[in-house]
Regions:
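Acidic di-acidic motifs
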Residues: 1-2, 57
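Conserved SAM-binding loop and adjacent beta-strand
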Residues: 2-15
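Conserved SAM/SAH cofactor-binding pocket of Class I
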Residues: 12-104
Length: 104
């Protein structure tokens, strides 16, 4: 499969990300290893003032994430690359980095 099914602890990570992001105006968040985009898409949909970036090394995974973002009208900017490299290459400043990487 192009992506893995999000694990139950994904919801806990999302709750923590929301608690950090919601009180801030225009928080900049990066989802590393976005996979299906579950975290990035949900965060962008629930916090429309946030700037959400999603990074994955897998082109097929990013295609799934892009479709999910479009389906939920979530404003997410996607980068293909290894971990934080696309963010570092662009010298981007971020407020929060989140990752729910596979461990299998």
């Amino acid at each position: 499969p192009a992506v893995l099914i999000p694990r139950p602890e994904t919801e806990l990570l999302l709750e923590a990300a929301l608690a950090f992001t919601q009180p801030r105006d225009h928080a900049v968040v990066v989802d590393v290893g976005t996979g299906s985009g579950a975290l990035a898409v949900t965060l962008a949909a629930l916090c429309p003032r946030a700037v959400v970036y999603a990074v994955d090394a897998s082109h097929p995974a990013l295609e799934v994430a892009r479709r999910n973002a479009a389906a939920h009208q979530a404003d997410v900017v996607f980068f293909e690359g290894d971990l934080l490299l696309p963010i570092q290459e662009r010298q981007m400043q971020v407020d929060m980095i989140m990752a729910n990487l596979p461990y299998i």
